[in-house]
């Protein structure tokens, strides 16, 4: 008989994944160091800020591309893929000595990684807790929010000791390993037949969510 995965371990892995992804939002720490390092090239805040804006925009794109396949393929592969993209984007930013490269690595690649991993990890956590969906969703969201608060100071310390570009490389490798390792325990949740006690309102499809104005309002907030 196949052993049922520990759902609390899966929830912990999802929280750790989202906390790691939250490093992408420690942009203020990274941007200051980038501007100081590339002052001779004439980089200004308006230019470097575009990298973060692109990353922010690519997150829902990643959700649109990968989200509809999570239920059929399973969350593990998309969290793993997200970890590869996120870590690679962060690591490659360590070589971004021009703005176009910065936009590609930190903007496009890293942003798509967040979209793939965050959507899958949050989804699997809530599906393993049909009786505590609010708790699971709240904890995974909190993990993401705590990411920049926890990793930001670490990044600042690394920047002071080794510089911004080496910091990107170190964080890229470490966070890739953390996210990809966490993905290994994210088994697909079993289908639970609804009863009078556990029946849940039918969820929306990704297309329906994207047509919902409330979704975009919450995302912008």
Segments from the language model and where they lie:
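Intracellular juxtamembrane helix-capping segments at the cytosolic ends
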Residues: 34, 107, 115-129, 136-137
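Flexible cytoplasmic inter-helical loops of multi-pass small-molecule transporters
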Residues: 187-204
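Helix-loop-helix hairpin linking two adjacent transmembrane segments in secondary transporters
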Residues: 139-189
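Hydrophobic core of transmembrane alpha-helices in multi-pass small-molecule transporters
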Residues: 19, 89, 100-116
């Amino acid at each position: 008989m196949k052993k049922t995965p520990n759902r609390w371990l899966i929830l912990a892995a999802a929280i750790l994944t989202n906390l790691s992804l939250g490093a992408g939002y420690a942009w203020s720490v990274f941007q200051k160091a980038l501007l100081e390092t590339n002052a001779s090239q004439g980089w200004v805040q308006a230019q470097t800020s575009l990298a973060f804006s692109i990353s922010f925009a690519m997150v829902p794109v990643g959700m649109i591309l990968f989200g509809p396949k999570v239920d059929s393929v399973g969350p593990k592969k998309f969290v793993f893929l997200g970890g590869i993209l996120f870590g690679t984007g962060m690591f490659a930013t360590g070589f971004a000595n021009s703005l176009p490269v910065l936009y590609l690595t930190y903007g496009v690649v890293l942003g798509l990684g967040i979209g793939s991993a965050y959507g899958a990890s949050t989804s699997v956590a809530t599906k393993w807790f049909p009786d505590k969906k609010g708790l699971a969703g709240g904890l995974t969201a909190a993990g993401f929010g705590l990411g920049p608060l926890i990793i930001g100071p670490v990044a600042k310390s690394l920047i002071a000791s080794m510089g911004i570009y080496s910091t990107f490389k170190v964080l890229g490798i470490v966070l890739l390993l953390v996210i990809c390792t966490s993905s290994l325990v994210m088994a697909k949740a079993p289908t639970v037949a609804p009863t009078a006690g556990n029946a849940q309102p039918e969820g929306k499809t990704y297309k329906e969510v994207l047509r919902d104005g409330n979704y975009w309002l919450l995302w912008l907030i």
